[in-house]
């Protein structure tokens, strides 16, 4: 009976992840549409990300003969680890899934980032190596702040399960510590997903790129997997932000849309900061989380 229940929860979690995977390009399209409206532009269709993925999927994959198997496997690992993290989220279809431990969730995403950084070095190109080194530099500051956000929520809810955290989120988010954690996690969300002000996902200037530098040598289906996984990762963080940190009594779908609009607004009102100022930005988020932990 217990095994059947666990298998059911796993199946529901995978169904939820598939739903998020299908909706991820739409959320990215909505963010771009919000940015276009705020800049008095018409902008591309909210369905444009689907067209781009279909375009890349139909093109051949060109690989240099000097790359190893790591270069080919990295997009698949990045995609699968992000999909596995999406399976662990509570809510939507799976109710309160019991296998979503927050530490496993964090390090699944870190594993995907590690493989992408290694693959950028594997191509032995100047821009790829630069992007990989910058990604690792940012990750060195992001990961401790993410763990502080996790610690703050664990202390609030007395649980490391994402499901357990979501059950007690209403009573937590109305406190001063909850508001500080909400703001800090939103700042971490932008940094973790390479959004402005930490990185610009739409830039064409190689010298200012971080995440996009690591994808310059990819093409075809491997490039489609990378972009799709990045869009899914952004949606996963928005769902997590909506379920655990956003203090609004609304359905999760509406809170995710509010988070997506907030990302678009913040990106429009800010410029990309210099690389060496990222640590100050993340230090501010870390300080808010530390205050949230002390305030409990």
Regions found by a protein language model. Name each.
Residues 4-5, 9, 150-179:
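Juxtamembrane/interfacial segments at transmembrane-helix boundaries in multi-pass membrane proteins
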Residues 12-24, 96-110, 170-192, 241:
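Alpha-helical transmembrane segments
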Residues 22-34, 112-120, 182-200, 260-269:
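Transmembrane alpha-helical segments that form the membrane-embedded catalytic/substrate-channel core
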Residues 38-64, 190-223:
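Cytosolic, membrane-interface loops and tails of multi-pass inner-membrane proteins
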Residues 83-100, 116-125, 155-160:
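Transmembrane alpha-helix boundary signature
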Residues 104-119, 140-157:
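Mid-bilayer segments of alpha-helical transmembrane spans in multi-pass integral membrane proteins
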Residues 215-249, 255-264:
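Alpha-helical transmembrane segments of helical membrane proteins, especially in multi-pass transport
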Residues 262-289:
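Interfacial loop-to-transmembrane junctions
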